Amino acid sequence: MRTHYCGNLNKSLAGQTVELCGWVNRRRDLGGLIFIDMRDREGVVQVVVDPDMKDIFPIANQLRNEFCIKFTGEVRVRPDSQVNKDMATGEVELYATGLEIINRSEALPLDFNQTNSEEQRLKYRYIDLRRPEMSDRIKLRARASSFVRRFLDENLFLDIETPVLTKATPEGARDYLVPSRVHKGSFYALPQSPQLFKQLLMMSGFDRYYQIVKCFRDEDLRADRQPEFTQIDIETSFLTSQEVRNVTEKLVHDMWKELLDVELGQFPVMPFSEAIRRFGSDKPDLRNPLELVDVADLVKDVEFKVFSGPANDEKGRVAVIRVPGGAKLTRKQIDGYAEHVNIYGAKGLAWMKVNDRAAGMEGIQSPVAKFLSEDVINGILDRTQAESGDIILFGADKAGIVAEAMGALRLKLGTDLELTDTSAWAPLWVVDFPMFEEDGEGNLHAMHHPFTSPLGVNAEELKANPAAANSDAYDMVINGYEVGGGSVRIHSAEMQTAVFGILGIEAKEQQEKFGFLLEALKYGTPPHAGLAFGLDRLAMLLCGTENIRDVIAFPKTTAAACLLTDAPSLANPASLEELAIAVKLAEKKEQA
């Protein structure tokens, strides 16, 4: 039906007759002529309809926004005075000789000239996606997928599919369950990741695997999460963790160079413990210059129990953030930051303004200064390298609360005070994660997943002191977002059984849930390691947006609903009967 895309017309086509298909982006009547800005996925071009073209001029008079149309015409170069530098095709226009209305459009439920609610945009997503901004995002995501396939193919990886209907395994989030009609009362689970199947592929001899695959997690949602998401899944045999990082770092480095013409440079490597200590997060945003500084040793002996209590608790922490120029913050602003850290479990936010460093104690303004000696205050000022005009903010509590609360405060300060360099890219690797973490009741859980190999210990050593073990795991972080995570996997049945035991999975349950894996590990399993990227999150960063829904064609809401199709919906009673399922809905309480 067409010979060219609207957005691809240029001066090299001058004098040629072309056929274009697309939509009316805008119509203008000027000096007897009708001007149509015609749009397709590649861009917009101006079409001129002359009243002398008597066959098509009356049809052009009928055109309204979003009519689906076809134009035939001659590409003409615009006079210099009429060149539109705001359009990629602004040097040319199409002089129409033929016009067909393919389909008319009713008045749109969305207004492209104003901000529409997200609910409206999701309900009429097929219209929202016509906007050039959205179209460009989806196209950039497609280019990213294409680049990944090309890169991995060239590096001898094999694209192999794994099952979507599989068995429920504990991987941290709730599974989406699918009832079996044949095996009544039994359920499949949609995969949270292809983790075990890709490990089995390594055992099968396919030493370099990848897959761009849908994964499903029934978890609470936020701006950068969806119930169904796309993963770039990678697994290798006979590569060390460093070698896996080298390959996957090059993938991202080359992707940014090709798609954005950005040179990321070599990614720094940071141990988990350093990330938590300096930034309060295992996915630090290095564009933000603020850091946490530990001062527990300086306040151990003060009478102020808010500080000395955590300072003398082996599980406690006292840390501060120095905010350059922060002395200008008002009490109302400081109270707002106190409310912010409360969200993360902190009980308050002590502060100290350094109005004049040279004036000694006279230059200090703080509600807690009266509880601290001059030596302690000077020690804090020296350690943080505080200067006149700065403010120091304190966090004192259990170490986990301090890290989370002060880490979140650091990010908010960086945004509010424009300290974070939003024009920069700051990738890094975070490595040497703890193998296990406590759940608050003394039980251990795998920090990543139970198939991650410990670092530098055998099974007996791991069982003797599991809480002290680190894992051979690694996360790639860009601008504060974890975009990929991976690890060396356990490749011996002895070690896998030991890890299951530490996690409280008894022998019988091990066989019920993971018997196939433990059996497979007996037959010459190679050492293997891998990584999975979140394609949605990578695309979000590439497109410069902060909402993952902006780079997914048909996303769900934060309530895991599809406003376009009204999914999820009640099932047909006959279908439920065939599946031997009875649905019991909670009764709604009557309002008084």
UniProtKB/Swiss-Prot annotation:
Tell me where it mainly resides.
cytoplasm
Concerning Pfam families, the annotation shows:
GAD (PF02938), tRNA-synt_2 (PF00152), tRNA_anti-codon (PF01336)
What InterPro entries is this protein classified in? Aa-tRNA-synt_II, aa-tRNA-synth_II, aa-tRNA-synth_II/BPL/LPL, Asp-tRNA-ligase_1, Asp-tRNA-ligase_1_N, Asp/Asn-tRNA-synth_IIb, AspRS_core, GAD-like_sf
What top-level class of enzyme does the UniProt entry assign? ligase
Q: Where does L-aspartate bind?
A: 171, 217, 448, 489
Name a GO molecular-function annotation: nucleic acid binding
- Places the protein is found: Cytoplasm
Reaction(s) catalysed (UniProt annotation): tRNA(Asp) + L-aspartate + ATP = L-aspartyl-tRNA(Asp) + AMP + diphosphate
Q: Which residues form a coiled coil?
A: none
Key words, A-Z: Aminoacyl-tRNA synthetase, ATP-binding, Cytoplasm, Ligase, Nucleotide-binding, Protein biosynthesis
Q: Which NCBIfam families match?
A: aspS_bact (TIGR00459), PRK00476.1 (NF001750)
**Classification via HAMAP family:** Asp_tRNA_synth_type1 (MF_00044)
**Assembly and binders:** Homodimer.
Q: Per its database record, what is this protein's job? A: Catalyzes the attachment of L-aspartate to tRNA(Asp) in a two-step reaction: L-aspartate is first activated by ATP to form Asp-AMP and then transferred to the acceptor end of tRNA(Asp).
Protein name as it appears in the record: Aspartate--tRNA ligase
Quick one: which gene encodes this? aspS
